[in-house]
Amino acid sequence: MSAAKNININLKIWRQKNASSKGSMETYKLDNVSTASSFLEMLDQLNEQLINERKEPIAFDHDCREGICGMCSLYINGRAHGPDTGITTCQLHMRMFNDGDTIYIEPWRSKAFPVIKDLVVDRTAFDRIQQAGGFVSVNTSGNTIDANSIPVPKDDADKAFEAAACIGCGACVATCKNGSAMLFVGAKVSQYALLPQGKVEATQRVLNMVRQMDEEGFGNCTNTGACEIECPKGISLENIARMNREFLKASLK
């Protein structure tokens, strides 16, 4: 890895006061950005500059800054989470850019993710889908079976863990030409469909989650595969196929 250096960049950033107001791209110039800094640290630096200039800082989502929570959600130069692969926005570093580059930064674009302010969008649609069926029933009467005593085939356990890696960032929706949430819902359905603990609500779970997904206004899946490519956790399209099978079985019962 080459030594860190400072670069000067131009930024085209979407600014919007709220969901009901019109937004536009605004231009900013930022100098002396270390290539060792993260993308969000670069935005912090820009906001410090704006505050010193007595201007409104840019609103953007972030929390853990470790690629775990799924809060950071920026469309950078036409790609969800930016030009690198297998990472979230907070894991993107400025060494991916060159001196003099112009960087375009936009919020997630989806009817189901309305803009709250600037680069922050409302992703509570995902929460409502999860609440519709993303859970398992647990006996709390005192006769609970130890989870470790329930055998799970190794292959099923591995696939369940892979599905559970979904952090709900919404990159799949943002990058999909149809604004589909099938990869997210497929991962959540698969996570429980593969485990014996998830069999209790299996039928109602997939029906409820798919119905809620449709009510939220997400688009249909046309198997383009962009969601899998841009997913920072590498969630496989196999989960969509599994959800479709679960939905068909549940619909026929």
Regions found by a protein language model. Give the residues of each.
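N-terminal mitochondrial targeting presequence
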Residues: M1-A4
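Eukaryote-biased recognition of intrinsically disordered, low-complexity regulatory segments
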Residues: N6-Y28
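Ferredoxin-type iron-sulfur electron-transfer modules in oxidoreductases and energy-metabolism complexes
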Residues: S37-E56, Y104-K253
